[in-house]
Regions:
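Short, flexible helix-loop junctions that flank or precede catalytic/ligand sites
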Residues: 1-347
């Protein structure tokens, strides 16, 4: 089987990831579980050859020098794939994550209605957070698509690597990938402010300088979408502030309290019928009360403010989990595994 056939099999079986690992058969992750494909183990030369087949010369050079690489590529008519190629003690390995060629709309994702409002904010910072594989990219792509279909403007994305490819609809869209199109998130963000964007998507707020530039862009009148690997709104605020040295923390809290629009923290759970996964969200809207808590570093009080903020579209993760259990979409056990207060989900 060549890599194209393996990827076609992976997509057909609705796998999120294809794992190629020297010494083992190919494996796919379906609805969160890793399963073996009924094929003989791959040798190092097999995996190495498959990886090289989908790389260009520049990527091969990086892989040889750095021993690992992130990149994306497409098979026309099938899907795009985000690839991490690396080495382990048995030899070459790679993980190929499927990026569907069709960008799902917010409606198709059954996303809360307020996500559409976040997508059309004229300025400010909207963060989508959660662990790896929680669907952050899918949610953000749907929000960017909503903006693209409803407003006239310029959307600039900075990604590592480019995942969903957007067509320009009402908006002009320019997508830049770290590596081929820019040397770093920081360089691209500095340039972005001179590229007349209305909206900037930053693939990952991974260090102090990127966070500083994203905050600055949001403060100067741009809509900025970004992701972090945090599991709640409170942890997101703490993570951003903690990156900065002590003498800057107060200034960062002030900037964040003025520019933040919303934090969506999401996780994916198996559906009760076992046929797929569903996203559960904590949603924090930057109301005057929330802005005040950020400014005054009263992050511990944020959870109760979200709990009582349903009138403006806020919800805690546990409130959303309760609703999903009540609607028979997920089991009590699945809710318990993700809940902040598992004791509220007996059985």
């Amino acid at each position: 089987m060549d890599i194209s056939e393996l990827l076609a099999f992976s997509v057909k079986n609705k796998a999120s990831d294809l794992h190629l690992s020297a010494g083992l058969p190919p494996m796919i992750r379906v609805h969160g579980d890793v399963r073996r494909i009924n094929l003989p183990p791959l040798e190092h030369k097999d995996v190495h050859g498959m990886i090289y087949d989908i790389m260009n010369d520049g990527q091969r050079k990086v892989y040889e020098e750095m021993l690992e690489i992130d990149f994306s590529f497409a098979i026309p008519g099938l899907a795009r794939f985000r690839v991490n190629a690396y080495n382990q003690e048995r030899g070459a390995s790679a993980v190929l994550r499927t990026i569907p060629s069709k960008i799902l709309s917010l409606e198709e994702l059954n996303a809360p209605k307020i996500f559409a409002e976040f997508a059309l904010k004229p300025r400010g910072l909207v963060l989508v957070t959660g662990p790896t594989g929680s669907g952050k990219s899918t949610t953000l792509a749907a929000m960017v698509n909503h903006l693209n279909e409803n407003e006239y403007g310029h959307i600039l994305t900075i990604e590592d690597p480019i995942e969903f490819v957007h067509e320009s609809k009402k908006c002009l869209i320019n997508q830049r990938e770290v590596g081929p199109h820019t040397l770093s998130f920081n360089n691209a963000l500095r340039s972005a402010l001179r590229e007349d964007p209305d909206c900037i998507l930053v693939g990952e707020l991974r260090d102090l300088e990127t966070i500083r530039l994203a905050l600055s862009a949001a403060e100067t009148g741009h809509l900025v979408f970004g992701t972090l690997h945090t599991s709640s709104a409170a942890k997101t605020i703490d993570r951003i502030v903690d990156v900065f040295p002590a003498d800057e923390k107060e200034m960062v809290r002030a900037m964040l309290s003025e520019s933040l629009q919303a934090v969506i923290s999401q996780t994916l759970l198996k559906t009760k019928d076992g046929t797929g996964r569903v996203a559960a969200h904590e949603i924090m809207v930057a109301t005057p009360a929330i802005r005040n808590l950020i400014r005054e570093a009263k992050i511990a009080q944020m959870y109760s403010a979200i709990q009582t903020g349903s009138g403006v579209g806020m919800q805690t993760l546990d409130q959303n989990l309760t609703d999903l259990v009540r609607r028979n979409i997920i089991s009590g056990a699945a809710a318990r595994s993700a809940a902040k207060s598992p004791e509220n989900f007996p059985g």
